[in-house]
């Protein structure tokens, strides 16, 4: 497995925005119906290796969102938390879910709450989620457990009217809130004609080898669906354009999303190869912590619990944040 300091090539996203295989639709994209059961090979099975662990390549950012030079010079440190949503109703039923919008099970709700307890002492300034309810439920339930007790508020920018109607006019209330930004680009991989089918029955119908290829290969999509490679195109591009600039500015970010969109982002952060990422498994409701500093991502694993000493020993800033929470709590109890 590649480490955070290796310089292996992974996937190149030079042509992300001009991919001919997808266009935006209700689920965020529409898969070209010309896709077949065979691989639709593309040129970007290699991510550009960078001089630092993860550094900026401004050619991949849109001009309006290019990170200013002064933000790159700052030595801001920021936390990045990744959480796969809790168990969904279709996870429980062993169905292919993809972009079908199904809620959490009771177990999934408990997983989201437990995830929140694990990160309750880690600062969060902004939350990104997919546009799917299971990821949004996970984000909201997790943040309810945070010791700062700030209220997560979903931002609606789908229209000017939606923006106006959901406006908050109290500065005090705004200061006690955390913005939640939904993005279809963080949605689960679209499973095409497999969505809603039972996984076991699908294996019996098409053969175990064929279904395994659809599910675990990097560049072979299911019928009229996305490959992991195609999912990575949109997820990593969104991360580079919208999330990395927040981290560079010192904002602490949480992402609540899905197995394949998060695997894509981790592939980028950890510089995994195409072969390494297909064996990466993410459990539901388990948070992963990264520290972003001086243009580099440092993987810190998963917090075992809110009082795990190791999480706060990683950086002086996290230790100070936790101590402030303790001091504030003592003042309130006095």
UniProtKB/Swiss-Prot annotation:
The active site is at 85 (tele-phosphohistidine intermediate), 188 (proton donor/acceptor). Its main location: plastid. It comes from the Eukaryota. Residues 1-48 form a transit peptide. Keywords: Chloroplast, Gluconeogenesis, Glycolysis, Isomerase, Plastid, Transit peptide. The record marks 258 as: Transition state stabilizer. PROSITE patterns: PG_MUTASE (PS00175). Belongs to the phosphoglycerate mutase family. BPG-dependent PGAM subfamily. The lineage of its organism: Eukaryota, Viridiplantae, Streptophyta, Embryophyta, Tracheophyta. GO terms for molecular function: phosphoglycerate mutase activity. Pathway: Carbohydrate degradation; glycolysis; pyruvate from D-glyceraldehyde 3-phosphate: step 3/5. Substrate binds at residues 84-91, 97-98, 134, 188-191, 199, 215-216, 259-260. NCBIfam families: PRK01112.1. It is an enzyme of class 5 (isomerase). Catalyzes the interconversion of 2-phosphoglycerate and 3-phosphoglycerate. It catalyses: (2R)-2-phosphoglycerate = (2R)-3-phosphoglycerate. PANTHER family: PHOSPHOGLYCERATE MUTASE. This is 2,3-bisphosphoglycerate-dependent phosphoglycerate mutase 1. It is found in: Plastid, Chloroplast. One of its GO terms (biological process) is glycolytic process. Its EC number is 5.4.2.11. GO terms for cellular component: chloroplast.
């Amino acid at each position: 497995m590649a480490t955070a300091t290796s310089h292996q090539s992974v996937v190149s996203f030079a042509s992300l925005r001009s991919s001919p295989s997808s266009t935006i639709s209700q689920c965020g994209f529409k898969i070209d119906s010309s896709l077949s059961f065979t691989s639709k090979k593309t040129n970007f099975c290699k991510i550009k290796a960078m001089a630092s662990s993860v550094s900026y390549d401004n050619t991949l950012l849109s001009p309006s969102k290019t990170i200013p030079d002064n933000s790159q010079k700052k030595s801001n440190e920021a936390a990045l938390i990744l959480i796969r949503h809790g168990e969904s109703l279709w996870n429980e039923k062993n169905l292919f879910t993809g972009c079908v919008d199904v809620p959490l099970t009771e177990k999934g709700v408990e997983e989201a709450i437990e995830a929140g307890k694990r990160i309750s002492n880690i600062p969060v300034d902004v939350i990104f989620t997919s546009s799917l309810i299971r990821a949004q439920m996970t984000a909201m339930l997790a943040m309810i457990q945070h010791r700062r007790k700030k209220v997560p508020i979903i931002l609606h920018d789908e229209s000017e009217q939606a923006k106006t109607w959901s406006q908050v006019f109290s500065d005090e209330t705004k200061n006690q809130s955390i913005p939640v930004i939904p993005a279809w680009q963080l949605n689960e991989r679209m499973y095409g004609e497999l969505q809603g089918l039972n996984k076991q029955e699908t294996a019996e119908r098409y053969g175990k080898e064929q279904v395994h290829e659809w599910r675990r290969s990097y560049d072979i999509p299911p019928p009229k669906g996305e490959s992991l490679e195609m999912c990575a195109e949109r997820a990593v591009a969104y991360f580079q354009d919208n999330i990395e600039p927040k981290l560079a500015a010192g904002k602490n970010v949480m992402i609540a999303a899905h197995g394949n969109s998060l695997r894509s982002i981790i592939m980028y952060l950890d510089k995994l190869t195409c072969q390494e990422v297909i064996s990466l498994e993410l459990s539901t409701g388990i948070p992963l912590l990264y520290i972003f500093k001086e243009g580099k991502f440092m993987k810190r694993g998963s917090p075992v619990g809110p009082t795990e000493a190791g999480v706060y020993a990683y950086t002086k800033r996290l230790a100070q944040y936790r101590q402030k929470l303790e001091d504030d709590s003592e003042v309130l109890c006095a």
